[in-house]
């Protein structure tokens, strides 16, 4: 029965990543901890986070390729926050190992539901005067890169989740990127963030790879496939459709994860 939940968790994670750049751990970690007995125990959450981060690498990579092919990515304004997030994610991974069993924070889950409702109410997030792709970083963006990149990076390494969702908010609301561009840039950053954080988790606790390599391989394949399909869908439809689907996905996933975290547990 556990293998069924592995597939469901990876499928949900892949759809979330390809559609809105959602961190795989936001979906996978609570499901693995609550529904899969093999992820219980002192290092259960740490192992679940490592599996989710590993699933995020190729899932984010194929999504990034799809968004980049449609020119929905902006690296000139995203490089600085990316560098900061990468450094802090490695630090967060080490801190997570020192603190032991950490369960996904409730704030991220509530935030996911709120953002989902926001997209349902206002699905078309396109601005009248969006910032053009390739515009150089201004002082405001530099300050925001440090102010937002430090907590996002540390949080991604620490609990493996929240990075994609919070990056989407920062890039769209504060950097002025259009929704698809924000998602494409976010998944690009998450590709390397997940790689650094996953490698850090495994190097700090090598037993994860030897004990969970089969689970990790299955989740990577399922999440990557789901991410590719959902990313292609997102880039072929208009912003309103993406917004509506995003709203439904985030609201349903957020409510489901809250139930798993607080009612089931």
Language model regions located:
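Residues within membrane-spanning alpha-helices of integral membrane proteins
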Residues: 3, 53, 108-112, 116, ...
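Interfacial loop-to-transmembrane junctions
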Residues: 230-251
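Small-residue-rich hydrophobic segments that form or flank transmembrane alpha-helices
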Residues: 3-85, 89, 93, 146-153, ...
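Transmembrane helix exit motif
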Residues: 59-70, 109-134, 231-232, 254-265
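Loop-to-transmembrane alpha-helix entry segments
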Residues: 98-111, 124, 241-244, 263
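Membrane-water interface at loop-to-transmembrane-helix junctions
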Residues: 135-151
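Residues that define the loop-to-transmembrane-helix transition and helix capping
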Residues: 46, 76, 102-105, 180, ...
């Amino acid at each position: 029965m556990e293998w069924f939940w592995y597939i469901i968790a990876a499928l949900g994670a892949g759809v979330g990543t390809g559609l809105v750049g959602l961190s795989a751990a936001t979906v996978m970690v609570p499901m693995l901890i609550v529904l899969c007995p093999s992820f219980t125990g002192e290092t259960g959450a740490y192992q679940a986070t490592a599996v989710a981060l590993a699933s995020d690498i190729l899932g984010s990579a194929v999504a990034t390729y799809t968004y980049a092919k449609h020119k929905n990515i902006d690296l000139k304004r995203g490089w600085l926050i990316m560098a900061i997030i990468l450094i802090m994610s490695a630090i967060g991974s080490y801190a997570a190992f020192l603190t032991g069993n950490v369960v996904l924070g409730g704030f991220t889950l509530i935030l996911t539901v709120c953002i989902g409702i926001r997209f349902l109410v206002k699905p078309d997030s396109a601005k009248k005067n969006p910032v053009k792709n390739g515009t150089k970083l201004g002082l405001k963006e530099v300050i925001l890169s440090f102010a937002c990149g430090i907590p996002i990076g540390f949080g991604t390494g620490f609990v493996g989740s929240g990075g994609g969702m919070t990056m989407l908010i920062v890039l769209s609301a504060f950097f002025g990127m259009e929704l698809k561009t924000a998602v494409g840039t976010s998944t690009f950053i998450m590709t390397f963030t997940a790689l650094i954080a996953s490698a850090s988790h495994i190097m700090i606790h090598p037993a994860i790879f030897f004990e969970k390599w089969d689970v990790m391989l299955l989740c990577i394949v399922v999440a990557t496939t789901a991410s590719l399909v959902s990313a292609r869908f997102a880039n072929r439809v208009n912003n309103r459709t993406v917004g509506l689907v995003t709203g439904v996905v985030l609201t349903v996933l957020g409510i489901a994860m809250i139930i798993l975290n607080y009612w089931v547990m």
